[in-house]
């Protein structure tokens, strides 16, 4: 009998459909306690408005039905105007497809709908942005209609009966569009222009994800929880270098493939388990990439050298496969890995009955994490200009993060995705002001009592990029300004209200750091880090409120000096070598002598999942306490010691850890050989273009030049060199850090 029951279990496991590029880690079915934890998870999410009621769902369906009818009417009319035969006009069709969070079934209350208008071959893109746009103009219930034709994915945005809709367009190389059209068929991409392929890609990826998960309802609930957690923890933003909705969906889908029968509460825990131990930059794949004869560019590090430098690749499952996380930087990956580890520790506590789900959804206190911040301010003179300006500046903040983390003295630059209204007292000229905050961790320097750090060029390169982009697209108007200021944590109250800055209830990591076992480590870190509070800031820009509200005291016991330059533009006259008039002036960056190996992108040294899985290699798993060797704990201190951290007081029991390691070990043995062929070779190559040790051309101003940008920003680098060799520097930020 025992043998028969064992055979029955094996047969049932063989019959279960296999998802993903490896076999599952566990086929265990949920227990009663798992369902209880899942219901508690649902209850914890309800106050955040993640679930729509039946009435709201039906309203969305009605709106989409109206839009679908409008599209069919428009395509029929335009077919008739192009003298197609009546028999063809009657059957030409047309259809609206949804994608994104709405198609996945995880949209929240009030969320917009991403939709795709699919038209037959005789309908041009220009028709969509002209005649269909005009048709929408005269439609009842449509408000805030605007077209963004020059976007990466061209789109028409509008509000239809209270529902915001982003509508993109694609025409297929077929004569009619039937209601049962399947966009997952790769042949639909044949003979299409790149804009149509991009428009179709959203639907194709979304549909493919849903086809690659074992249980759609469990996937949706798990994804709702993970997306809410990511938003609450400040790591939900593709634009700023974190992850967007599609990337989070693919990570959750991969977790569902590894634990196909698990309940949502278990899957949330396993999500943190898998990705806190993932060896980036190994790619996350939902299926093996498929070959196609369409010759479209796909993500493939073996072919494309630039793909080898992606830090956190998550590959879309639909052809042409792309990396959805190309914006991720070293700093944003570091922050996310730390959050994965924090999430694992919290869910361990929850599933042990020591805590509840609300703890997982607690926001971090970003303004208590770091000792140093950069305040980025975007201002404009009118509300309309401000909305445009803020959108452009925000889209370029990741350029600033990249500049800062390439600075040899900076370990981490952490941008808070939330923007804040500016203090009007400090920006009396402009009534519309937005601020972003970047937490900075400075790197220690061996055998140095103090270090002079100049961030001027990092900031100026960023502001030049934004102004130049605005000028190129004719957006730049009078009153549009960017300012960057260095402030210390104790100065933040000049910028933000007390309720935002006040210390919240201690987080799990704060509790662990305050435990006695970590006191010795903290003191050793402080003694080897130049990120102390006794630093000297000699370059805070003119607009810092500190200079106006807190006079410097040179006789203070700590020797702290806080002085700010009094003018917005620092004019530095230097004896520079003569330069021919036709050439630009090249000034080396401060600290240009950088060891190339120190600035190259490298894989984190987490030793939990081996990079190469060989036939004769038995994976050996260790569990380092630091997220990445040499990676900073996100508390404003650069962690560069190799000491082993004592076991945290809230760590799970040893037997639980052992079980988790067995799960991961099983996963390792089954992991795909997709990455084997290139891992060893590619890791030897380092991106030289990310090294910050080369000279940067500093643009100069010709005083005889008649045309100036409205923003008074520096002109482009082709400007002639003035005869008096005066270098104009804006947003000057210089500071001195003492040990």
From Swiss-Prot:
It comes from the Eukaryota. It is found in: Nucleus. GO terms for cellular component: cytosol; nuclear body; nucleus. The record marks 152, 157, 327, 398, 531 as: Interaction with RNA. Residues 677-688 have a biased composition (Basic and acidic residues). It catalyses: RNA(n) + ATP = RNA(n)-3'-adenine ribonucleotide + diphosphate. The modification N6-acetyllysine is found at residue 2. CDD domains: NT_PAP_TUTase. The keyword Phosphoprotein applies. Pfam families: PAP_central, PAP_NTPase, PAP_RNA-bind. This is Poly(A) polymerase gamma. It comes from Mus musculus (Mouse).
